[in-house]
Amino acid sequence: MASTLKKSLKQFTPPILVNKTKDLINYINFLKYKEIVKNNVELKDKHKGGRCFLLGSGPSIKDENLKPLKNEIVFALNNFYVHDDFSEIMGGNIEKYYMTAPIHPPQSEREWIDWFSDMDNYVPNNSTMIFGISNQVNNVKNIVDQNNLFSTHQKYWYYSGINIYEHYQHSPADIDISKMTWIADTVSIYALVFAIYMGFSEIYLLGMDHNYICHKESDYRFYKNGIHQKNEDKRTIKESSRTKHASLGIYKIFSQYELLSDNSDTLILNTSKNTLLDIFKYVALKNII
Protein backbone atom coordinates (compact mmCIF):
# COMPACT_ATOMS: atom_id res chain seq x y z
CA MET A 1 0.00 0.00 0.00
CA ALA A 2 2.75 2.42 1.02
CA SER A 3 4.75 1.53 -2.09
CA THR A 4 1.73 2.14 -4.33
CA LEU A 5 1.06 5.50 -2.67
CA LYS A 6 4.70 6.52 -3.11
CA LYS A 7 4.58 5.66 -6.82
CA SER A 8 1.34 7.61 -7.26
CA LEU A 9 2.77 10.68 -5.54
CA LYS A 10 5.88 10.52 -7.70
CA GLN A 11 3.79 10.17 -10.85
CA PHE A 12 1.63 13.22 -10.15
CA THR A 13 4.24 15.49 -8.55
CA PRO A 14 5.78 18.00 -11.00
CA PRO A 15 9.47 17.14 -11.63
CA ILE A 16 10.58 20.68 -10.75
CA LEU A 17 8.97 20.31 -7.32
CA VAL A 18 10.63 16.94 -6.80
CA ASN A 19 14.05 18.40 -7.63
CA LYS A 20 13.56 21.50 -5.48
CA THR A 21 12.58 19.24 -2.57
CA LYS A 22 15.74 17.19 -3.11
CA ASP A 23 17.80 20.39 -3.19
CA LEU A 24 16.26 21.51 0.09
CA ILE A 25 17.06 18.18 1.76
CA ASN A 26 20.62 18.44 0.45
CA TYR A 27 20.92 22.02 1.71
CA ILE A 28 19.92 20.98 5.22
CA ASN A 29 22.70 18.37 5.14
CA PHE A 30 25.10 20.91 3.60
CA LEU A 31 24.77 23.12 6.69
CA LYS A 32 26.92 20.60 8.61
CA TYR A 33 29.79 21.35 6.21
CA LYS A 34 29.10 25.01 5.49
CA GLU A 35 32.08 26.31 7.47
CA ILE A 36 34.69 24.20 5.68
CA VAL A 37 33.13 24.72 2.25
CA LYS A 38 33.14 28.51 2.56
CA ASN A 39 36.95 28.35 2.82
CA ASN A 40 36.90 27.82 -0.95
CA VAL A 41 36.51 31.58 -1.30
CA GLU A 42 40.31 31.61 -0.87
CA LEU A 43 40.48 30.13 -4.38
CA LYS A 44 38.41 32.85 -6.08
CA ASP A 45 40.42 34.18 -9.06
CA LYS A 46 43.60 32.70 -7.57
CA HIS A 47 44.90 31.93 -11.08
CA LYS A 48 43.21 34.77 -12.95
CA GLY A 49 44.42 34.89 -16.55
CA GLY A 50 46.40 31.65 -16.28
CA ARG A 51 45.99 28.28 -17.92
CA CYS A 52 45.58 24.75 -16.58
CA PHE A 53 45.23 21.16 -17.71
CA LEU A 54 42.60 18.71 -16.47
CA LEU A 55 43.84 15.12 -16.53
CA GLY A 56 41.22 12.42 -16.96
CA SER A 57 41.45 8.67 -17.47
CA GLY A 58 40.35 8.18 -21.09
CA PRO A 59 42.49 5.67 -23.04
CA SER A 60 43.61 8.32 -25.56
CA ILE A 61 45.87 9.81 -22.90
CA LYS A 62 48.22 6.84 -23.40
CA ASP A 63 49.20 8.35 -26.76
CA GLU A 64 50.40 11.62 -25.25
CA ASN A 65 53.73 12.68 -23.78
CA LEU A 66 52.59 14.23 -20.51
CA LYS A 67 56.00 14.90 -18.96
CA PRO A 68 56.10 18.58 -20.08
CA LEU A 69 53.07 19.15 -17.82
CA LYS A 70 55.53 19.20 -14.94
CA ASN A 71 55.79 22.92 -15.70
CA GLU A 72 52.03 23.51 -15.90
CA ILE A 73 49.20 23.83 -13.39
CA VAL A 74 47.27 20.57 -13.53
CA PHE A 75 44.19 19.05 -11.95
CA ALA A 76 44.72 15.29 -11.70
CA LEU A 77 41.33 13.62 -11.42
CA ASN A 78 40.07 10.58 -9.51
CA ASN A 79 42.37 7.61 -10.23
CA PHE A 80 45.02 9.45 -12.25
CA TYR A 81 47.68 8.68 -9.64
CA VAL A 82 48.17 5.26 -11.30
CA HIS A 83 49.60 6.90 -14.46
CA ASP A 84 53.23 5.92 -15.09
CA ASP A 85 54.37 9.56 -15.28
CA PHE A 86 52.30 10.78 -12.33
CA SER A 87 55.24 11.61 -10.06
CA GLU A 88 57.00 13.65 -12.73
CA ILE A 89 53.84 15.49 -13.79
CA MET A 90 53.09 16.44 -10.19
CA GLY A 91 56.64 17.65 -9.55
CA GLY A 92 57.99 21.10 -10.34
CA ASN A 93 57.59 24.43 -8.60
CA ILE A 94 54.07 25.25 -9.72
CA GLU A 95 50.65 24.55 -8.20
CA LYS A 96 49.27 21.03 -8.56
CA TYR A 97 45.76 19.95 -7.66
CA TYR A 98 44.29 16.51 -7.10
CA MET A 99 40.51 16.22 -7.20
CA THR A 100 37.96 13.49 -6.56
CA ALA A 101 34.19 13.35 -7.04
CA PRO A 102 31.87 12.62 -4.11
CA ILE A 103 31.83 8.92 -3.24
CA HIS A 104 28.78 6.88 -4.19
CA PRO A 105 27.35 3.35 -4.50
CA PRO A 106 27.89 0.59 -5.49
CA GLN A 107 31.29 0.71 -3.79
CA SER A 108 31.47 -0.25 -0.14
CA GLU A 109 33.03 1.93 2.53
CA ARG A 110 35.92 -0.55 2.73
CA GLU A 111 36.64 -0.12 -0.99
CA TRP A 112 36.67 3.67 -0.64
CA ILE A 113 38.98 3.51 2.39
CA ASP A 114 41.38 1.25 0.50
CA TRP A 115 41.33 3.55 -2.52
CA PHE A 116 41.95 6.78 -0.62
CA SER A 117 44.64 5.10 1.48
CA ASP A 118 46.45 3.98 -1.66
CA MET A 119 46.06 7.43 -3.20
CA ASP A 120 47.58 9.00 -0.09
CA ASN A 121 50.71 6.90 -0.64
CA TYR A 122 51.29 8.37 -4.10
CA VAL A 123 50.07 11.97 -4.17
CA PRO A 124 53.03 14.24 -3.29
CA ASN A 125 52.70 16.67 -0.40
CA ASN A 126 52.96 19.71 -2.69
CA SER A 127 49.57 18.79 -4.21
CA THR A 128 46.42 20.50 -2.98
CA MET A 129 43.62 17.99 -2.45
CA ILE A 130 40.03 18.82 -3.44
CA PHE A 131 37.36 16.43 -2.16
CA GLY A 132 33.63 16.30 -2.89
CA ILE A 133 31.01 15.77 -0.19
CA SER A 134 27.37 14.82 -0.80
CA ASN A 135 24.44 13.58 1.26
CA GLN A 136 25.73 10.00 1.34
CA VAL A 137 25.91 8.61 4.88
CA ASN A 138 29.51 7.57 4.29
CA ASN A 139 31.39 10.47 2.74
CA VAL A 140 35.00 11.26 2.07
CA LYS A 141 35.24 13.75 4.95
CA ASN A 142 34.45 10.99 7.43
CA ILE A 143 36.83 8.57 5.74
CA VAL A 144 39.71 11.06 5.64
CA ASP A 145 39.21 12.16 9.25
CA GLN A 146 38.66 8.72 10.75
CA ASN A 147 41.63 7.17 8.96
CA ASN A 148 44.00 10.16 9.31
CA LEU A 149 44.53 10.40 5.57
CA PHE A 150 46.19 13.24 3.64
CA SER A 151 47.32 14.76 6.95
CA THR A 152 50.26 16.54 5.29
CA HIS A 153 48.27 17.95 2.35
CA GLN A 154 46.36 21.18 2.05
CA LYS A 155 42.70 20.22 1.59
CA TYR A 156 39.59 21.91 0.23
CA TRP A 157 36.06 20.52 0.32
CA TYR A 158 33.07 21.18 -1.91
CA TYR A 159 29.47 20.13 -1.40
CA SER A 160 27.50 18.64 -4.29
CA GLY A 161 23.78 19.16 -3.75
CA ILE A 162 22.01 21.04 -6.58
CA ASN A 163 20.16 18.85 -9.08
CA ILE A 164 20.65 19.69 -12.75
CA TYR A 165 17.39 18.50 -14.25
CA GLU A 166 16.08 18.63 -17.83
CA HIS A 167 14.75 22.21 -17.69
CA TYR A 168 17.33 23.57 -15.26
CA GLN A 169 18.06 27.29 -15.67
CA HIS A 170 21.71 28.17 -15.12
CA SER A 171 22.53 30.48 -12.22
CA PRO A 172 26.09 31.69 -11.50
CA ALA A 173 25.37 31.22 -7.79
CA ASP A 174 24.98 27.48 -8.37
CA ILE A 175 28.62 27.12 -9.39
CA ASP A 176 29.98 29.21 -6.52
CA ILE A 177 32.13 26.55 -4.86
CA SER A 178 32.10 28.39 -1.53
CA LYS A 179 28.45 27.32 -1.30
CA MET A 180 26.45 24.22 -2.22
CA THR A 181 27.05 23.49 -5.90
CA TRP A 182 25.92 21.17 -8.71
CA ILE A 183 25.46 17.43 -8.57
CA ALA A 184 27.56 16.61 -11.64
CA ASP A 185 27.79 13.27 -13.42
CA THR A 186 31.56 13.14 -13.76
CA VAL A 187 34.56 14.57 -11.94
CA SER A 188 35.68 16.60 -14.97
CA ILE A 189 32.56 18.78 -14.59
CA TYR A 190 33.51 19.54 -10.98
CA ALA A 191 37.08 20.30 -12.10
CA LEU A 192 35.82 22.73 -14.74
CA VAL A 193 33.62 24.46 -12.16
CA PHE A 194 36.66 24.90 -9.90
CA ALA A 195 38.96 26.04 -12.70
CA ILE A 196 36.45 28.65 -13.88
CA TYR A 197 35.96 29.87 -10.30
CA MET A 198 39.73 30.13 -9.89
CA GLY A 199 39.91 32.51 -12.85
CA PHE A 200 41.79 30.48 -15.46
CA SER A 201 41.34 31.97 -18.92
CA GLU A 202 42.43 28.79 -20.73
CA ILE A 203 41.48 25.25 -19.71
CA TYR A 204 42.71 22.19 -21.61
CA LEU A 205 41.07 18.78 -21.29
CA LEU A 206 43.10 15.57 -21.57
CA GLY A 207 41.73 12.05 -21.34
CA MET A 208 38.10 13.20 -21.56
CA ASP A 209 37.22 10.62 -24.21
CA HIS A 210 33.69 9.77 -23.05
CA ASN A 211 33.64 6.94 -25.57
CA TYR A 212 33.09 4.05 -23.17
CA ILE A 213 29.99 3.19 -25.17
CA CYS A 214 32.42 2.03 -27.89
CA HIS A 215 34.55 -0.16 -25.61
CA LYS A 216 34.31 -3.13 -23.32
CA GLU A 217 34.64 -2.28 -19.62
CA SER A 218 38.33 -3.20 -19.39
CA ASP A 219 39.15 -0.59 -22.06
CA TYR A 220 37.21 2.35 -20.60
CA ARG A 221 40.35 3.95 -19.19
CA PHE A 222 44.12 4.13 -19.68
CA TYR A 223 44.48 1.56 -16.88
CA LYS A 224 42.78 -1.83 -16.65
CA ASN A 225 41.61 -1.99 -13.04
CA GLY A 226 41.09 0.41 -10.15
CA ILE A 227 40.86 -0.46 -6.48
CA HIS A 228 37.39 1.07 -6.37
CA GLN A 229 36.23 -0.02 -9.83
CA LYS A 230 35.87 -3.80 -9.71
CA ASN A 231 32.98 -5.12 -11.87
CA GLU A 232 31.52 -1.62 -11.89
CA ASP A 233 29.14 -2.19 -14.81
CA LYS A 234 27.77 -5.42 -13.40
CA ARG A 235 27.22 -3.88 -9.97
CA THR A 236 25.69 -0.66 -11.30
CA ILE A 237 23.45 -1.63 -14.20
CA LYS A 238 23.03 -5.34 -13.38
CA GLU A 239 20.98 -6.91 -16.21
CA SER A 240 20.02 -3.63 -17.89
CA SER A 241 21.25 -2.51 -21.30
CA ARG A 242 24.81 -1.18 -21.05
CA THR A 243 24.31 0.85 -24.23
CA LYS A 244 21.18 2.49 -22.87
CA HIS A 245 22.87 3.25 -19.54
CA ALA A 246 25.99 4.68 -21.21
CA SER A 247 23.99 6.73 -23.72
CA LEU A 248 21.94 8.39 -20.98
CA GLY A 249 25.11 9.05 -18.99
CA ILE A 250 26.82 10.69 -21.97
CA TYR A 251 23.75 12.83 -22.66
CA LYS A 252 23.67 14.12 -19.08
CA ILE A 253 27.42 14.78 -18.98
CA PHE A 254 27.45 16.58 -22.32
CA SER A 255 24.48 18.70 -21.24
CA GLN A 256 26.49 19.79 -18.19
CA TYR A 257 29.54 20.57 -20.33
CA GLU A 258 27.27 22.64 -22.56
CA LEU A 259 25.89 24.60 -19.60
CA LEU A 260 29.42 25.58 -18.60
CA SER A 261 30.48 26.36 -22.15
CA ASP A 262 27.43 28.53 -22.84
CA ASN A 263 27.73 30.47 -19.59
CA SER A 264 31.46 31.15 -19.37
CA ASP A 265 33.92 33.32 -21.28
CA THR A 266 36.73 30.90 -20.44
CA LEU A 267 38.46 29.24 -23.39
CA ILE A 268 37.97 25.50 -22.95
CA LEU A 269 39.70 23.21 -25.46
CA ASN A 270 39.75 19.44 -25.80
CA THR A 271 43.12 17.82 -26.50
CA SER A 272 41.78 14.27 -26.21
CA LYS A 273 42.27 12.09 -29.27
CA ASN A 274 39.58 9.58 -30.24
CA THR A 275 36.96 11.36 -28.18
CA LEU A 276 33.20 11.70 -28.53
CA LEU A 277 33.34 15.03 -26.70
CA ASP A 278 32.51 17.62 -29.36
CA ILE A 279 31.25 20.42 -27.11
CA PHE A 280 34.72 21.98 -27.17
CA LYS A 281 37.08 22.54 -30.09
CA TYR A 282 40.00 20.14 -30.50
CA VAL A 283 43.64 21.21 -30.35
CA ALA A 284 46.67 18.93 -30.47
CA LEU A 285 48.52 18.87 -27.15
CA LYS A 286 51.90 19.08 -28.88
CA ASN A 287 50.91 22.49 -30.29
CA ILE A 288 50.38 24.10 -26.88
CA ILE A 289 53.15 22.71 -24.65
List the predicted regions and their residue ranges.
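Metal-ion/cofactor- or nucleotide/acyl-coenzyme-handling active-site neighborhoods
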Residues: 2-289
